[in-house]
Amino acid sequence: MCLPSHLLSTWVLFMAAQSLGKTWLPNHCRSPIKAVCNFVCDCGDCSDETQCGFHGASTIPSTSFTCNFEQDSCGWQDISTSGYRWLRDRAGAVLHGPGPHSDHTHGTDLGWYMAVGTHSGKEPSTATLRSPVMREAAPTCELRLWYHIASRDVAELRLDLTHGVETLTLWQTSGPWGPGWQELAVNTGRIQGDFKVTFSATRNATHRGAVALDDVEFRDCGLPIPQARCPLGHHHCQNKACVEPHQLCDGEDNCGDRSDEDPLICSHHMATDFETGLGPWNQLEGWTRNHSAGSMVSPAWPHRDHSRNSAYGFFLISVAKPGTTAVLYSPEFQGSVSNNCSFTFYYYLHGSEASHFQLFLQAQGLNTPQVPVLLRSRHGELGTAWVRDRVDIQSAHPFRILLAGETGPGGVVGLDDLIMSSHCMLVPAMSTLQSSLSGPVPLALYPQTSIKLPQQTCEPGHLSCGDLCVPPEQLCDFQKHCAEGEDEHKCGTTDFESASAGGWEDISVGKLQWQWVEAQEKSKPAGDANRDAPGHFLSLQKAWGQLRSEARALTPALGPSGPHCELHMAYYFQSHPQGFLALVVVENGFRELLWQAPGGGSGSWTEEKIILGARRRPFQLEFVSLVDLDGPGQQGAGVDNVTLRDCNPMVTTESDQELSCNFERDSCSWHTGHLTDAHWHRIKSHGSQLDHTTGQGFFMFLDPTDPPARGQGALLLTRPQVPVVPKECLSFWYRLYGPQIGTLCLAMRREREEDILLWSRSGTHGNRWHQAWVTLHHQPEASTKYQLLFEGLRNGYHGTMALDDIAVRPGPCWAPKSCSFEDSDCGFSPGGWGLWTHQSNASGLASWGPWIDHTTGTAQGHYMVVDTSPNVLPKGHVAALTSEEHQPLSQPACLTFWYHMSVPNPGTLRVHVEESTRRQELSISAHGRSAWRLGSVNVQAEQAWKVVFEAVAAGVEYSYMALDDISLQDGPCPQPGSCDFETGLCGWSHLPWPSLGGYSWDWSSGATPSRYPQPSVDHTLGTEAGHFAFFETSVLGPGGQAAWLRSEPLPATTVSCLRFWYYMGFPEHFYKGELRVLLSSARGQLAVWYQGGHLRDQWLQVQIELSNSEEFQIVFEATLGGQPALGPIAIDDVQYLAGQQCKQPSPSQGEVAAPVSVPVAVGGALLFFMFLVLMGLGGWHWLQKQHCPGQRSTDAAASGFANILFNADHVTLPESITSNPQSPPDLA
């Protein structure tokens, strides 16, 4: 075997490394093995940090090392021992599967992630994903990732870290699981030497076990690199690294060689790590010293201590009962005004929002201890990390430090590594002061203010105001229950002139925090939002935490809120591109991004309005920011003048009852829902997005790829409405446009009832507005309120949805112009024997019916079916299905429908049009070989009319008839297989195939603005007003994805002519879309014509003669043969001339292809012959390679089917060669 010269050296190195028993990595600069995968780029191209569970892409310090699984698995390996295993997978592989339909990186189905699929085994099993060996994690190292779990699919998730002989559990949970992608952030702590990370999912017999993992990020994990000189004031470590002065003697190995914690440097510090006891500290009650090895008392307990980062390390934990306080107190220290005494400590708050940690300073008065002064207060859920903090103390009197912890239900408060700096001088043991302070007085004896509070008469958690006791659920509910509104005082609305800050509380755990500050003239911003220099605002400030985490400020629990609820505020923001300022809502433990400051900010105060809408209680608002305060320029962030307006849910306006809306003034009664991070937006017409009302006005718009949307869909719903009449007609205009757009649904919601699906459409409906209408059936009780909701589902990611001109009128609607039976029976009523049934094969009542519907091609799709077996419908008897009334027609129309008749002859399907009289338009008796067939009827009706389908039974056992996808289109019915696309796609179907990516051909005209490139004129009319079918190939990803446009089933033919015009436009030759013509039958698919195109701004004609001995469909396949680029493929004026040979047309506009004769018989012999030909070509190519040429000829034609068999548009097929491209099974 010969190897190319450029691969030979790589192969030799690999074999040499294997022979020496060493790990071989693509390390271009040959770093020592200890410097590989250590979160530091030693090579100029960072190649020493690839396949490490992440990819090193930048040599910039503090850059995160990430893996988004788009190119490979980054070295992560499945080490599962059962069939329940991890693999790298792509989003949307299964349309209705349990996994995510989009990845987290891109939010589309083109993205990749690691996934463990469903497992049908009855035994419990665990799928384990393990990282490669990593080395030397810094104390600041943070691992972040996103995971996705279908509801109740997994029993447990856990994240472990193994180093040496110990395995640390970094995170573990058994739910509850939230919707969509959820973020996990854990701190690894300082890890010396080698370590691995494992992510595992455990399922049992009651769980399917579908889990996905994406966007793994290692943040700030690298140790500082050696430097010849350190910045002024920094400490130079023994290994030549530099650390900041406050990192000395702080209980963490910041240098990487522990020289910053050298006992010689830290000998004057008083450090207590609880490994051998409490040291000089004492407790009144409630604290106990413990470790995490073995079984833990509570799931919220720390899995490791801070000092040793080990489960065997000791810490203090609060064991006080909920409602009581555990108190730890220090020895007495001497007072000093000249020197700061610094106290560094690490605390742990996890498991309960009600847990509380406080730090008090208690100074000694002349004779007795003074009232303790609160210096730090933290409460709530701060995660599983040990949080560092520090206080600097200046006291003229001797003092003690008191640490108080109060645990909420299921919560834990922990302490570790209490460090007093060298300037904290102990009071001599036998001093007079020491003897006078026999011990601290319990905290409960000291009120925190000098005002004597009245005796509390309300229960804990209740607010006392006058004679009222306001319960917790009525606090911050946007309704005043107290006379002075005290129950709404600390609920987010504030100008920050009061120290209470309107209830906003900092919950940061890292190097940044939110603080209530006074504006200074010499700093930025120079004043608050009111331009007052002494004014106050909420400002982003430095903190003593060790992690590079976002700063967070949170309100108390709020709600419920009404649909008009808005937050008005002023903000200041200036940052480099990586910084941000955002507003988040926290609801049921999950976070939704509401707003983010644009770009790098303006550096001045800016007013902003954010719609919050109707939300259930409890929810909280949170300001989140990450800014490099040490970076160049005056970077920073601030918030002021926060006002929550119109949030009372009881407040109504006239517009709340306005269902009819053209969205020109506002959104009337319609408002956005908040179940996911995808949202409808009211926008003004611009570019290719034009409203329906005027073409220049407003409408509701949804872009499924609008960042940062990752949720399943977006809701647009009304306020609760009171019915006016028993039946109302709701009409609206909608647009579903794009090569891979999702589903738009309309539903009705009543209290304590399941939502009622009224209408739905999926996939592209062309680049235009369509009108739809639905009859609303109200309950007899007039007091029963209802809501209407439109939901745009993100099961497609290329295209847009839009709504406009919603109108409601009394009385029922006309019959719909199209019906897929997916949401309802569309008003069709069974007559006669009443045997027609609305069902799907998966959940049907009829004994017999099609395996799949026509709309979705799945067993879950719906249709109408009648069982014509003699025991149900005797021979000669009729089962009728009658539509509602259609409005009169101003011009002839074509009624199309798809029917399915069993192979045992079920009888006859008759179609009648009932105007003033009933007239039969069509009669079908052929069974159609158990496949969906297209039927069509020309309709002319000057009055209101109905369509009636009649099933006449033949008395045959196990027989049935079914109907699906009934549609009424303007203009006469076209011939089978033919279409000029002026009124639509005729009988051609663009149903997306999930196995091909779920893409669809679209329908448009040159005059209609489009976000995708398209021909400027059609071929039929040669003008911008003409229409055509087209597909934009740039949305396709790699891996054989394609879009199909399929004809209706066509009968067997000895000779027929297919004639069509096509258009292809690509900027360069290597940007190549491909157009194929396939013939599909029960035996597979056969490619009969192919063209790969580049820029040709003209329409070209092709003729193909076809013959086939069995029924078939014509398929136009658009796919990608090169690099993705904007470029359309379009077709127009398709003619199928049954029983006719192709004739050479006279030259006309554009080029003309020569006719091609293609006898089609997709038999086993031909497929086998094709296999032999391909094997022969492959063998010839292999033999050629054995000569090992040094370089190919630069002017040789590229090998491939295109240049061999096709020349421009003149097609020459070898007489007996066929191809069988991989594709879904029989399309019939």
Swiss-Prot record:
- Which positions fall inside the LDL-receptor class A domain? 28-49, 229-267, 457-492
Sequence ranges on the Extracellular membrane side: 23-1159
UniProt-listed SUPFAM superfamilies: Concanavalin A-like lectins/glucanases, LDL receptor-like module
Q: List the disulfide bonds.
A: 230-242, 237-255, 249-266, 458-469, 465-482, 476-491
Give the superkingdom in one word. Eukaryota
One Pfam match, given by its short name, reads: MAM
Q: Which InterPro entries match?
A: ConA-like_dom_sf, LDL_receptor-like_sf, LDLR_class-A_CS, LDrepeatLR_classA_rpt, MAM_dom, MAM_domain-containing
Query: Where does the record say carbohydrate is attached?
Result: 204, 290, 340, 641, 841
State which residue ranges cross the membrane.
1160-1180
Question: Span of the secretion signal?
Answer: 1-21
Task: Outline which residue ranges sit on the Cytoplasmic face.
Answer: 1181-1228
Q: What is this protein called?
A: Apical endosomal glycoprotein
What gene name is given for the protein in this entry?
Answer: Mamdc4
